[in-house]
Amino acid sequence: LGAKQPQMATTMSVRLEGQGKLSDGTTRFEFGLVKQGFAWAFPLAGGVNIGVGSFIGKQDADPEQVLAQLLPDLGFAADAGIRQRGQLRVWNGHHRLDGNGIVVVGDAASLCDPFLAEGLRPALMSGCEAARHLSPWLKGDSKDLRGYSRSMRERWGESMAWGRRIAQVFYRFPGVGYQLGIKRPTAPRRIAQILSGEMGYGDIAQRVIKRLLLQRN
């Protein structure tokens, strides 16, 4: 089940105590600091979680070099926090997520956002959807669990297909992507709307890709 050849993003996360210079309720994304990759800082209860990772290319980004720049800018020492290396299974296409009495959810289903590298919301979403479809199946009211795969495709996969297209262009041409996408006054609000589920990538994808390709040419 799931992706036959998963696409992985190599990551390093750092858990920090205190907020540093990060304001209450504020999330920070860095585009261009990591070649063909990402860096972000999410607030937690009593602290901050920082992630650095790379999507494209055989050579991984040097996360320590990135953190040496990012952490002081956030108000922390360059060597602060506990480092943890890992990998994210990035969404890379529509795949069947159910079998005979089996469903895959979260990271096992390769649901991580291919542009923002966010995986918590799809993990929660897939868990809730799995429960919603398993309940009638266990009661004998449903003959299979195919509805789970269909539901995740509609609720998550359709948007991620557009997100993947944006990421493929953006991370290859980050300078152009920054000027035409991230630097725009509406960009922070659009990112927040995508993270919250208020908006999907399909709502903005065609305009963004058209801007990126026209500028590149």
What are these regions (language model features)?
Residues L1-G81, R89-R96, S110:
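Predominantly flavin-linked oxidoreductase catalytic cores and closely associated redox partners
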Residues V48, N92-M160:
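Conserved mid-domain beta->alpha element of the FAD-binding
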Residues E30-Q36, G57-D60, G75-A78, Q87-V90, ...:
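A general structural signal for short secondary-structure boundary/capping elements
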Residues P6, K21, A39, G93, ...:
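Short capping/connector residues at structural and topological boundaries
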Residues R132-N217:
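C-terminal helical "tail/cap" subdomain of flavin- and related membrane-associated enzymes
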Residues G57-A61, L124, S142, G181:
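Generic detection of long, well-ordered alpha-helical segments
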Residues W40, V66-Q69, E129, H133, ...:
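Alpha-helical scaffold segments in soluble metabolic enzymes
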